[in-house]
Structures are given as C-alpha cells and as structure tokens.
Amino acid sequence: KVTFDKNDEDITLDIACDLEKGTHTVTLFKRQDASHYFEFVGFEIDPDGEVLENPPLPARKIECYGDSVSAGAVCEAVDFVASCDPEDHQGVYDNAWHSYAMITARNLGAQIHNIAQGGIAIFDNTGYYHAPNYIGMESVYNKLCYFPEGAKGVTPWDFENYTPDVVLFAVGQNDPHNEGHEDFDITDPDYRAKWKNAYKSIIIDLRSKYPNATFVLLLTVLCHGEEWDKAVDEIANELNDEKITHFMFTRTGKATPGHPRLPEQYEMAEELTAYLSNMGDKIWG
C-alpha cells in the first residue's frame, strides 16, 4: 500500500528491487473511491528486462454502482469490526481491492467497473458526497468525471466503451441524509414515490444501454432501516423485468454501525458470488 501527498509533480515509487531472473507480475489498482484519481505515467524496468504481453482480460464483465461500502471504505480497520469507524481516519483504511464488489468479480473471473463513491445518494443535494454542493447518483452514473474540480471538469461517459453482463446497483444507504434538515423518511408516501421514481429512471436508462444485462439491486450489511430494503424490493417488482432482481445478504442492514471491515466484505462477496453463480452461465455474454 502506497500513499503520497504531492499533487502536482511526477513521483517515482520503487515497487521491487534485486529480483531474481524470471517472470514477475505486477498488479496495479486504485485503493479509493471513484472521485480520487491519479495519472499513471508508466513503469521503469531494468535495462536487461522486458515487458511481456498482458494476459487477455476476462470475457465476463460486471459493473457496480455504489457508495463507500462498494468502494471498500474503512474496510482495513479490522480492530473495529461491528463497531463505529475510527475517528479522523483520513482514508488510510480504505481499500477497494477488498470491497465485496471487486472480490465477487475476482471470484467469478470477471472484469469490473466499480463506479463507487463514498457518501453518494440517488438525488443531488442529498447524501454526503461533495459538500456543500452535494452530488447524487442521478448526476454521476453517466459521467466519466462527475466532479467539477477534475482536470477537465465534468465529462460524459461513452457507454459503448464497456458493456457489462451483470450490473450491481447498491445505492440507498446515504439517502436519508438531508443536511441542515430532518432526515428524509422513506415511509412517507410522497417521498417514497419520488425516490423510487428517480431510482427507476436510472435503472431504465441503464437497461436501455445494456439490454442483455442482468441487474441486481441491493443494499449492504451496513445498518439501515428495513423500509429502504422494502422500497428497493418494490422497485424490482414494479420494473417487471425477469433480469432485474433484488438481492439481500443474510445480514443486510444489520451487521455493523460502521463500514464493513474485511470479514464483512468477504462475507458479502461469498453470498453475492453464490447468488450470481446460481443463475448459471446464461447471464454471461
């Protein structure tokens, strides 16, 4: 795990030195959620070394839309299992590699695009992401860069670049938060209808782009009220599409008041892997 605090200059990091002769493999990944980014310039190797061809990417493809849990936030704080998060952790415990979404992809031998952003809700101006001008998934799901501070500002995503076989949609945990006001109440009929319609509009648009994909709607084991799960279940039923399902973990909404740690992330991945595996090979293009 490498951290650095310089934003405007090239940094050279020693990955390995004095290796024995032979074939070596490097796996490079970004630990934090989608709004964190770095520019990868390249590898420097020994003058006597050579770069071999990468093995082909898996044919199976998963895409995940989620929040901090899907991004693996605070998952390495293993001394705080089933507890609130450590104070002022500043992201040092984040590791997307150990998110249930990425574990599931590895379990199933699939590529994954993990569009997971900590604090995000469905609606703009709700949730916790990008205070005080909160940005919701309704403005994020179809963007490559979705925050105005990016080097090129907000940029659209070309859905032709990646067509998943399976879409995981795990948003809803942060939606009660209404900064400076009472939390949104999913049991209120008017709000419930508004929230469900916004959620469905995203799914319907994604379905139009991925007509053959299997969609799995879910919330995670981070504590939340069961009415949110019921609302997601209603959405799945109302969409009336046999390839759009609602999945619940054994401990959905009940396992921890803080972010899921490594044991809980792997627990979720095991259950989600089994769920997708039980659908058979037909879900993969």
Regions flagged by a language model, labelled:
Residues 1-96, 283-285:
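N-terminal secretory targeting modules
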Residues 52-55, 153-163, 204-209, 281-285:
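Surface-exposed acidic, glycine-flexible loop patches that form ligand/cofactor-binding
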Residues 61-65, 70, 112-116, 165-170, ...:
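Structural recognition of the beta-strand scaffold that forms the well-ordered cores
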Residues 70, 109, 113, 172, ...:
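Sec-exported extracytoplasmic/periplasmic mature domains
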Residues 86-188, 222-226, 259, 263:
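Conserved SGNH/GDSL esterase-like catalytic core that processes O-acyl groups on lipids
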Residues 195, 199, 265:
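Aromatic/hydrophobic pocket-lining residues that form the small-molecule binding cavity
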Residues 199-203, 232-233:
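Generic structural signal for well-ordered alpha-helices
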Residues 214-285:
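Extracellular serine-dependent O-acyl
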